Amino acid sequence: MKIQCDVCEKAPATVICCADEAALCPQCDIEIHAANKLASKHQRLHLNSLSTKFPRCDICQEKAAFIFCVEDRALLCRDCDESIHVANSRSANHQRFLATGIKVALTSTICSKEIEKNQPEPSNNQQKANQIPAKSTSQQQQQPSSATPLPWAVDDFFHFSDIESTDKKGQLDLGAGELDWFSDMGFFGDQINDKALPAAEVPELSVSHLGHVHSYKPMKSNVSHKKPRFETRYDDDDEEHFIVPDLG
């Protein structure tokens, strides 16, 4: 006995989908579950067909049984099923299933092989493109994080030292030219002698010169720095105001 596909209703079903609750043939299974990633994660169980010979009926032991009763836990043929479950209303409520002789696989399988066959293999150019970022990341890890100092000076490379030296010479020449008109006017003529003392030196005085120098003594001021005292004088008339009268 075979189960018909619930989608095309033509080919025999080989897979039962637990999420869709449908029996599917191989072609319909690929078309439905390869549509998107969510459908590809559905749990499917394979249907393994047993031998074409059905077991015998547990009641008559003569005819092939294809009905299973859950409450009676027995395989029944069509005649025995009618005689038992149609007799009264209580037995008519028993749960009975069709025993097709097909066994469901214990482990869930996903039709990954069929999907991989339909997908094209990546070309060599794509494989090379995937390998290039891995190499670039490894090169970045090998590079040191801190910048290494340069073996040559920046000033020597750009010749800043030569520029500074020429600027200093130009400034000195320009300064000397500006001071020429001071010498022409006689500012630096006789006023500055060769024997003039530097500004930082203090002239030394001989003992004879010290005699003429009058010693300076600070004059004492007659004004005293003491605080003035205020004296209070009481007259004889004022003493009467401080006498307490005797009331006794």
UniProtKB/Swiss-Prot annotation:
Ranges spanned by the short sequence motif Nuclear localization signal, renumbered to the chain? 226-229
Q: Which residues form a coiled coil?
A: none
* CDD domains linked: Bbox1_BBX-like (cd19821)
Which Pfam family, an example, fits this chain? Answer: zf-B_box
Enumerate the Gene Ontology biological process terms. photoperiodism, flowering; positive regulation of shade avoidance; response to light stimulus; seedling development; vegetative to reproductive phase transition of meristem
Compositionally skewed regions (Polar residues) per UniProt:
120-130
Modifications after synthesis and translation: COP1-mediated ubiquitination and subsequent proteasomal degradation of BBX24/STO occurs in the dark.
For the region Interaction with COP1, what residue ranges are annotated?
Answer: 236-248
| Keyword terms of this UniProt record | Metal-binding, Nucleus, Repeat, Repressor, Transcription, Transcription regulation, Ubl conjugation, Zinc, Zinc-finger
**Entry's Gene Ontology cellular component terms:** nucleus
Q: Name one GO molecular function term.
A: DNA-binding transcription factor activity
Please state the residue ranges covered by B box-type zinc fingers.
5-47, 57-99
**Effect of a null allele:** No visible phenotype under normal growth conditions, but mutant seedlings show reduction of hypocotyls length when grown under continuous blue light and a short primary root phenotype under UV-B radiation.
Question: Gene3D superfamilies per the record?
Answer: Classic Zinc Finger (3.30.160.60)
Q: Does the keyword Nucleus apply?
A: yes
Tissue specificity as recorded in UniProt: High expression in leaves and lower in roots and flowers.
Induction of synthesis = Circadian regulation with a peak before dawn.
Kindly provide the name given to this protein in its UniProt entry.
B-box zinc finger protein 24
GN (gene name): BBX24
